Amino acid sequence: GLFSKFNKKKIKSGLFKIIKTAGKEAGLEALRTGIDVIGCKIKGEC
């Protein structure tokens, strides 16, 4: 019925938010690691 439809939408948007946040966190972590690697390559300290 109407309630289950609304509930599914809520669950979907909740999951989407979690995935988006997790993706952002993972992306930032990868970016930081990449910057560190590039930095040490420039300095020749890898």
UniProtKB/Swiss-Prot annotation:
Compartment(s): Secreted
Record's GO cellular component terms: extracellular region
Keyword vocabulary terms for this entry: Amphibian defense peptide, Antibiotic, Antimicrobial, Disulfide bond, Inflammatory response, Mast cell degranulation, Secreted
Free-text tissue specificity from the UniProt record: Expressed by the skin glands.
The keyword Transcription regulation belongs to this UniProt entry's keyword annotation: no
Keyword Disulfide bond in annotation: yes
Disulfide partners: 40-46
Any single biological process term in GO: defense response to Gram-negative bacterium
Functional summary from the UniProt entry: Mast cell degranulating peptide. Causes histamine release from rat peritoneal mast cells in vitro. Has antibacterial activity against the Gram-negative bacterium E.coli K12 and Gram-positive bacterium M.luteus NCT C2665.
Family statement: Belongs to the frog skin active peptide (FSAP) family. Esculentin subfamily.
Name of the featured protein: Esculentin-1SEb
Organism in which the protein naturally occurs: Lithobates sevosus
